[in-house]
């Protein structure tokens, strides 16, 4: 659950994986949440989430996934890549995706959505033809007319 008192285990696992993979050729692929993405005003999505009422009941995972990204940015001896989904992530069609870097992406209708099928497609594309080394990228659903 998002408010889990053991949300810190996300970061614990990542630090162990980084330790084990230091100075190896094995690529570390990390799926982190959208909370560390930036909004148009320059704030992180996390800042907006922290301002919501009763956030303490569910903020543990988004907060710790932001810590994961901050930690990864300090790592220069592991071949890592991280991916953040759009704000709304869940079931849906696999019809293509649009890739970005550190900003919350929205379509022409202002929606920030990503289906699990399009997330899988983006991950497989990155594994088969790497474009990001020690970087994070984000993806959103491609609109039908894009």
Q: What is the meaning of each model-derived region?
A:
Residues 2-7, 24-28, 34-146:
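Oxidoreductase cofactor-interface core, primarily capturing Rossmann-like NAD(P)-dependent enzymes
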Residues 16-24:
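Glycosyltransferases and closely related glycan-assembly transferases
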